[in-house]
Amino acid sequence: TAKWTISPMRLIIGRRKKMRTKFLDKPYLVWSVLFIVAPLIMVVYYAFTDKTGAFTISNMAQIPNYLSTILLSVLYGIAATAICLLLGYPFAYFLSKHTVRTQQTIVLLVMLPMWMNFLIRTYSLMTILGGSGVINTLLNKMHLGSLNLINNGGAVILGMVYNFLPYMILPIYSVLSKLDNSLVEAAQDLGSNRTTVFRRVIIPMSLPGILSGVTMVFVPCVSTFYITQKLGGGQIVLIGDVIESQFQSANNYNLGAALSFVLMILIFICLGVMNHFDSGTEDGGVII
C-alpha cells in the first residue's frame, strides 16, 4: 500500500491560513458581541427587572394590554409586505430579462434612495402627500379639490412600501438573474406554456429570494415608529411607537424592554417560519 506524506512546508502554509482566518474572524466576533449579543442581553435584563434591578414579571404581565397594538402592527406589516411583493417581483423579473448594462443602471437607481437618510425619504413623501403638497397642489389647480392623503393608515402603508420596497426587489432580482434558463427551456420543450413555466418552475426556483425579501421588509415594517408618527399624524399607533414612547417620553425602560422582548420573540418566530419554508430549497429553489 502506498503511504501518503505531507511536506512540512504544506503544514506550515495550512497553519498560516488557519491563523489568518481566525485573525480575520476576530473583528466580526467582537462587533457581534458588542452590537448584537450585548444589546439583546440588556433587553432581556430590563424586561425582567424593575427600576431597582430586582427580578420581576410585572413588566411582562402588562403585555396583554398591548396585544391589540401588536396585532395591528403585524397586520400593517403583512399588508406592506404583500404590496412590496406584488410590486417587487414583477419588477425584479422583468429587470432580470434586460441586458447586463441595463440591469446595472436600474439596480443603481433602485439602490439610490437607500443611500439617503431614512428621515429625508419620509419627509420627501410628506411634501408629496401633504395638504399643500405636490399632488393636492396639482388637483387644486385643476379645480378638482384636495384629497386627504396623509395622517391615515393608507399613508403609513405607502410610507412603508416606499422605504422598504428595494429590500424586496434586490433579493428577488439576485436569484432571478442567476436562474438556469435551460430548465425553463426544458419545461417549454415538454409542452408547458408560459403560465405553467412561470408557476411551476420560475416561482419555486426564486423562492429563496422571495423569502429573503419578505423577511427584510416585514421585520422593519412591524417595528417602525417614525413612519407612523409623520405619515400617520399620531392617529396610527403601532408597537414601535409604544416602545419608543416608553424609552423617550415615559422613561420606563423596563416596560419598553419587555415590549421589545415580545417583539423580538415574534420576529424570531417569523424567521423560523420563513426558514421552515426555505429548508427545502437549495441553489435557487426546487421545481414542483
Segments predicted by a language model, with ranges:
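Membrane-interfacial helix termini and adjacent extracytoplasmic/periplasmic loops
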Residues: 122-161, 195, 231-235
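Short membrane-interfacial helix/loop motifs at transmembrane-helix boundaries
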Residues: 30-67, 128-129, 229, 233, ...
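Transmembrane-helix boundary motif in ABC transporter permease subunits
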Residues: 22, 79-110, 126-127, 182-184, ...
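Transmembrane alpha-helices
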Residues: 27-36, 82, 112, 162, ...
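Membrane-embedded alpha-helices of multi-pass transport/permease systems
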Residues: 37-45, 86-91, 119-123, 136, ...
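Interhelical loop and adjacent transmembrane-helix boundary motif
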Residues: 57-65, 225-280
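C-terminal transmembrane helix and the adjacent membrane-cytosol boundary/short C-terminal tail
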Residues: 1-7, 11-14, 22-28, 35-38, ...
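Non-cytoplasmic
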Residues: 39, 43, 168, 209-244
